[in-house]
A protein has these predicted regions:
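Primary recognition of N-terminal secretory signal peptides and signal-anchoring hydrophobic helices
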Residues: 1-193, 223-231, 235
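SH3/SH3-like beta-barrel fold
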Residues: 184, 196-201, 209
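Glycan-recognition patch characteristic of GH18 chitinases/ENGases
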Residues: 221-331, 336
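Glycan-binding loop/region signatures in secreted carbohydrate-active enzymes
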Residues: 222-227, 311-312, 319, 457-540, ...
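Short, acidic/polar
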Residues: 248-264, 327-342, 390-398, 532-545
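Conserved, mostly hydrophobic/aromatic
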Residues: 269, 351, 408, 451, ...
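Substrate-binding surface in catalytic domains of secreted glycosidases
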Residues: 279-286, 335, 358-496
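Acidic/aromatic/glycine-rich contiguous surface patches that form carbohydrate-binding/processing clefts
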Residues: 536-573
């Protein structure tokens, strides 16, 4: 059978991501400001978004390529002219453009350099701390230089080319040729789909060949060494029952005995003592030695909370960015935290940073790595609060956090929140269970995941919209039932009971949320409350048992009914 084939050759620079489209729509080669040659970066399943640079015999990767593909523990601080790597016990600092590590260890190569705003790191420096393979292929003819990377452990299939055959850009004879593979060339199978197979060569070519042109499939196992077992964790020998204690001034510390008077089964308390006070890494503190002494006398561990939103304004966000992205300031923050741990005899620390965006996530993770080293040395617990796993919070990288932290706390509430366009539960059981299971999938260790649960709920007020009259809350358009205004108020368990008791209504069980629910009319409005009570709390504790979690955390102490501890206690006695 005659097969019409395309004999055209693809522009390999374009194919490997070494060109860009200029303002006139023309493909233009990337250029660099420094000396050296641009090289394509062949990842395990495609070409990297960032090119590499070859200087003489030395090969350099964009640090973003390293972080995204090889190891997230590399970090660049352009402000202080540093490239760093942090493991379980130490941070290795190098000056950009230098050859020395931690000012004591000399190398025979330049470790890193800047090209414009981009940082490039020598593959030898990366290889010093991380087990992976690389191969440097020099440019030849129309083929650009390539840095070929292998970094994932596991099994992959290899096959042999039966006879000379063109590798193509896509799975069809009409697509352009990448290169010609010679008979008996060994290739790694990247993707199998019908008549065509995507393959990669040891020298960094990737593309499609007819499946019938391959033979002798064999499985090759790669096992790169990992240092994950060097990350020891400070863990409690019992299920954790943690209560956050909102402290907004020094006087509030005096209420400790009142706030824990009716608790049963509580074994950790987390006072919200610390927040960033400036852009230098200093802390605003409401810490109290007397508070810690009393808590310890009651058998409670104290994990003081540090947040980055203490002033709840634009300044707080700026503090977070400026402190975390500057190594000098970030280290000052770590030092201040550890000083407070020592001075107040704290058992651990709870990090609750919520002003983290994608631009500073690498700096936040570096902060956690650096803090974890000091906590590990001191034998103090490091717990980190996180939003419920979702596409919007994915960049927080719970998987990497769990490597360095002792416990990951998932704040499984605010499913519906102030400003929501829909009334609903603060934390339905389906929402909670998904949050827990997703967190376990990311951490791979349920025994270090703590589920944060609400001790509060919301009273939702729905008011029909009338012409010319503006209501309170969010305006919601509803073509079926009529437009309305929706507002809500956070309320305690006792307040919720007071409201529905005064309205002379009784709760009914809502199968959808797994909670008791009340609804009643108040004037022109409808009030709806998904209750937090013994039913919902028990269900969440059952989820803790089902998934074998490390424990639970309650936001916040003082919002619960006294009797709720009778429900909690059996799980922790």
């Amino acid at each position: 059978m005659f097969i019409k084939t395309n004999k055209g050759q693809v522009d390999q620079k374009w194919y490997m991501g070494l060109t860009y489209e200029d303002d006139n729509g023309n493909d233009t080669d990337y250029t660099i400001e420094t000396d050296g040659n641009i090289a394509a970066v062949a990842l395990e399943d495609g070409y990297g978004d960032e090119f590499g640079i070859i200087k003489g015999e030395e090969a350099y990767l964009n640090i973003n390529t390293i972080i995204k593909n090889i190891d997230k523990r590399f970090y660049v601080d352009a402000t202080n002219n540093l490239v760093m790597f942090t493991d379980a016990t130490k941070t290795y600092k190098t000056k950009i453009g230098g050859k020395t590590i931690n000012e004591t260890e000399n190398t025979d190569y330049v470790i890193s350099f800047m090209d414009g705003k981009n940082c490039y790191v020598n593959v030898k420096f990366v290889k010093k701390y991380v087990d992976f393979d690389y191969k440097v292929v020099k440019a030849e003819g129309k083929s650009p230089a390539r840095i070929v990377l292998k970094y994932t452990s596991g099994e992959k299939n290899q096959m042999t080319v039966k006879s000379n055959i063109e590798m193509r850009t896509k799975a069809d004879y009409q697509n352009l040729i990448v290169t010609t593979l010679k008979k008996n060339t060994k290739v790694t199978v990247l993707e199998e789909s019908g008549d065509w197979t995507k393959v990669g060569t040891d020298d960094g070519f990737m593309g499609y060949v007819p499946a019938k042109k391959l033979k002798d499939k064999e499985t090759k196992k790669t096992d790169f060494k990992s240092d994950a077992d060097t990350y020891t964790h400070v863990l409690m020998d019992k299920k954790i029952s943690l209560g956050w204690n909102a402290i907004t001034n020094l006087t509030a510390n005096g209420n400790l005995e009142t706030i824990i008077e009716h608790t049963k089964g509580l074994n950790v308390i987390s006072p919200t003592w610390y927040s960033l006070s400036d852009n230098k890494g200093n802390l605003r503190s409401y810490a109290s030695a007397t508070y810690v002494e009393k808590a310890h006398s009651k058998g409670l561990k104290v994990w003081a909370l540090v947040n980055d939103f203490g002033t709840q304004d634009k300044a707080s966000k700026e503090y977070t960015k400026k402190v975390l992205t500057d190594t000098t300031k970030r280290e000052n923050l770590v030092d201040n935290i550890m000083t407070n741990i020592k001075d107040y005899n704290l058992d651990g620390i709870n990090i609750d940073f919520e002003f983290i965006n994608k631009d500073i996530i690498n700096s936040y993770l570096q902060f956690l790595r650096e803090l974890s080293i000091e906590c590990r040395k001191a034998g103090k617990v490091l717990s980190i609060d996180n939003y419920v796993p979702s596409s919007g919070s994915e960049y927080y990288d719970i998987a990497h956090q769990s490597l360095v932290a002792d416990y990951i706390i998932i704040m499984s509430y605010d499913e519906h929140y102030a400003g929501s366009k829909e009334a609903g539960s603060v934390s339905s059981m389906t929402f909670t269970e998904k949050a827990v299971s997703d967190a376990i999938a990311l951490t791979c260790d349920a025994s270090r995941v703590i589920n944060g649960m609400p001790f509060y709920t919301r009273a939702w007020i729905t008011t029909p919209a009338t012409d010319g009259k503006k209501g309170e809350g969010v305006y919601v358009e509803d073509a079926t039932n009529g437009n309305y205004y929706l507002s809500s108020q956070a309320i305690t368990m006792d307040k919720a009971k007071e409201l529905y008791t005064n309205a002379k209504v009784k709760p009914t069980f809502d199968e959808t949320t797994g909670q008791n629910f009340v609804s009643y009319e108040k004037g022109d409005s409808t009030v709806s409350i998904w209750l937090e009570d013994a039913t919902s709390v028990k269900s969440r504790l059952d989820i803790m048992e089902k998934y074998k979690l490390a424990g639970v955390a309650y936001w916040r102490l003082g919002q619960e009914t006294d009797s709720i501890w009778d429900t909690i206690y059996p799980y922790f006695k």
